A protein has these predicted regions:
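Surface-exposed assembly/interface segments
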Residues: 1-390
């Protein structure tokens, strides 16, 4: 013990000071697919599988179902770490939906999309960009949003079965969760199995593109207005004009539906999510909140069970402030701060081993509506004669 009698020299380490905070990984895709002829060893049923090379993995994904096509769609955009859960194709769409939604067996094993919840414990990664390309019915979408909330991830959903703009807008009314974005219609592209043009799931492209944007730009940039690779068309007519709000695209965006446009290639158009809270109207607002939540929480496990001295609180606050300054300087946030509120940290609370630290932040808004004001004037004619003489 440090207080025991000793005739000599002792060294006691004092490990105080701020700790650096590392931002959690965000470019990790998680998806549920069908593919009955896939390699059963590489893609066992109802088990999360970690893939680090999606293009190579697509070669063992078979030809049926959605697995191979979805992996190829992601590979067209980027090469993100991907967690895949393969489920059996049912005899009917309803049976497939049940397989995708999954359950928990009597032995405690999670199946279907619920297996994504086991990814962190089994694989060491947490999927945050979620989708079920080609099979995201309303029932599947509803369950996927619940999984997204549990993982603090974000789900990209299709307006399943919708054929018109009005149907897509009506379909949007089924959801209120900030953890999702609704997309309509789909892309088209060349299908090497069918040897023909076919539907190319927009949600699968969204998964890959979201990971690409995270890696190249950051989670503060929305999915909108970034070129999409590997597609040749759009499955439905969507009228869009950059300067006219009275268009199909404008109406869809106004109702929180992201659409597809063709302008210098093909692009997603729309930055809004399904939130019923205006504070999280944009996709990147939700993802910013999620990233900060996990980053700040996971960065402070070291502090749990440490002696609750003023120096400990000071180290936590200074560490968070330093991280906020770093995120602001890199453009991920507009601003942020951290402080100790004395009113909630009274002696009884502190005596019970509880410490409350407050921090705030301002996310980076996407430039959704640029207004340029044009004026005609004759003032540049005032010096006409002098300019001629010169």
């Amino acid at each position: 013990m440090a207080q025991d009698y000793h005739h000599g020299v002792r060294v006691v380490e004092v490990n105080e000071g701020t700790r650096s905070i590392t931002t959690v990984s965000t470019a990790i895709v998680g998806m549920v697919c069908t593919g009955d002829d896939a390699d059963a060893k590489m893609f066992p049923l109802n088990k999360p599988v970690l893939i680090t090379d999606v293009l190579t993995a697509s070669g063992k994904a078979g030809e049926s179902g959605t697995l191979a096509r979805s992996l190829d769609a992601i590979a067209d955009q980027a090469k993100p770490v991907t967690v895949v859960v393969r489920v059996p194709q049912g005899e009917t769409e309803e049976e497939t939906t049940t397989n995708i939604i999954g359950a928990v067996t009597a032995e405690g094993k999670k199946t279907g999309m619920k297996a994504l919840l086991s990814a962190q414990s089994q694989l060491g990664v947490k999927p945050r960009i979620l989708g079920v390309p080609g099979h995201d019915t309303k029932a599947v979408a509803t369950e996927l949003l619940s999984v997204a909330q549990s993982l603090r991830g974000f789900a990209y959903l299709s307006a399943y079965g919708c054929k018109t703009v009005q149907e897509a807008i009506t379909y949007r009314e089924n959801f209120s969760q900030r953890e999702g974005m609704l997309i309509w219609p789909d892309f088209t592209g060349w299908d090497t199995v069918l040897n023909a043009e076919a539907t190319a799931y927009a949600t699968a492209r969204a998964l890959g593109l979201r990971a690409k944007i995270d890696e190249q730009n950051g989670w503060h940039k929305s999915l909108s207005n970034v070129g999409v690779n590997g597609v040749t068309g759009i499955s439905a007519d969507v009228f869009w004009d950059l300067q006219d709000p009275a268009t199909d695209a404008g109406l869809l965006n106004q109702n929180d539906v992201t659409t597809l446009i063709r302008k210098d290639g093909f692009r997603f158009w729309g930055s809004r999510c399904l939130s019923d809270d205006p504070l999280f109207a944009f996709e990147n607002y939700t993802r910013t909140a999620q990233v900060l939540t996990d980053t700040m929480a996971e960065a402070h496990m070291w502090a749990v069970d440490k002696p609750l001295n003023p120096s400990l609180a000071r180290d936590i606050i200074e560490g968070i402030r330093a991280k906020m300054r770093s995120l602001v300087s890199q453009g991920y946030l507009i601003g942020g701060d951290c402080w100790l509120d004395e009113s909630v940290n009274d002696k009884d609370t502190l005596k019970a081993g509880k410490l409350t630290i407050d921090y705030d932040y301002t996310p980076v808004p996407p430039l959704e509506n640029l207004m340029l004001r044009q004026r005609i004037t004759d003032q540049y004619l005032v010096n006409f004669s002098s300019q001629v003489s010169a």
